């Protein structure tokens, strides 16, 4: 009886171990030009550009590796790295995977068509094919997140963060100020660019649409909007499972 129980325990344990897995998700890639719709161009670097005469709006998903290279001096201290867009060069124990801190897009607007154009970065949002919705985060929200992440913060002008944690918080906030997409008008023959930040996508998100709504392209004499346009950009990524032996199975495959 004891031998039978031990054999059953061993069999169940091995079976559970063999079936264990973790989720993975690849980098975001744009859908084809045919799927994007009219007036869209898809470039080799993964960016999608919407053209309305000489107004060009370009959106490109950023990988953590790219963001770490761009802020290389601020990405070598693991999770404590001042890079506000990633966890730096940190890795999960044993798997070697890099944890995802945010979902980041680079937005570029080039206006050579209208007297002025206005795009509110805080109104950009994501919808997914499985019913999820993500709203863009502003700098104040990210600053509060990092103030709490550092510990000891109480808000206001004196956050109460001690020592090196305060320095790291200020470095992160400074990078965000300089690199997030600015909330300002773009006058004729001007360009504006910066990052749009969202919460990390859930592991089951495969197909998504980035909505850039109510882009103002014409104003009346009082400065009120009289003509707007909406832009939608589609991206997808491979998702699936990774098994203990390192094999990957995409969500449409059968293990």
Residue spans of the language-model regions?
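N-terminal secretory signal peptides that target proteins for export/translocation
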Residues: 1-2
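Sec-dependent N-terminal signal peptides
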Residues: 5-14
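C-terminal motif of bacterial Sec signal peptides marking the signal peptidase cleavage site
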Residues: 16-18
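Conserved functional micro-motifs across diverse proteins
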Residues: 20-255
């Amino acid at each position: 009886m004891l031998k039978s129980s031990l054999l059953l325990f061993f069999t169940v344990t091995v079976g559970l171990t063999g079936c264990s897995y973790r989720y993975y998700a690849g980098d975001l890639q744009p859908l084809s030009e045919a799927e994007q719709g009219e007036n869209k161009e898809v470039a080799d670097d993964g960016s999608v550009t919407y053209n309305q005469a000489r107004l060009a709006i370009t959106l490109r998903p950023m990988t953590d590796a790219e963001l770490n290279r761009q802020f290389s001096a601020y990405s070598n201290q693991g999770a404590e790295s001042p890079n506000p867009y990633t966890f730096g060069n940190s890795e999960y124990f044993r798997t070697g995977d890099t944890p995802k801190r945010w979902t980041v897009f680079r937005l570029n607007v080039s206006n050579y068509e209208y007297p002025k154009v206005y795009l509110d970065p805080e109104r950009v949002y994501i919808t997914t094919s499985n019913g999820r919705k993500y709203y863009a985060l502003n700098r104040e929200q990210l600053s509060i997140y990092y103030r709490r992440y550092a510990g000891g913060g109480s808000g206001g002008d004196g956050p109460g963060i001690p020592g090196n944690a305060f320095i790291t918080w200020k470095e992160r906030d400074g990078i965000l100020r300089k690199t997030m997409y600015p909330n300002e008008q773009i006058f004729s023959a001007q360009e504006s660019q910066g990052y749009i930040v969202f919460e990390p996508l859930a592991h089951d998100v495969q197909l998504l649409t980035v909505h850039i709504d109510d882009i103002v392209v014409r104003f009346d004499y009082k400065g009120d909007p009289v003509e707007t346009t909406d832009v939608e950009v589609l991206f997808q990524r491979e998702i699936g499972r990774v098994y203990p032996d390192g094999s990957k199975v995409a969500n449409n495959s059968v293990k």
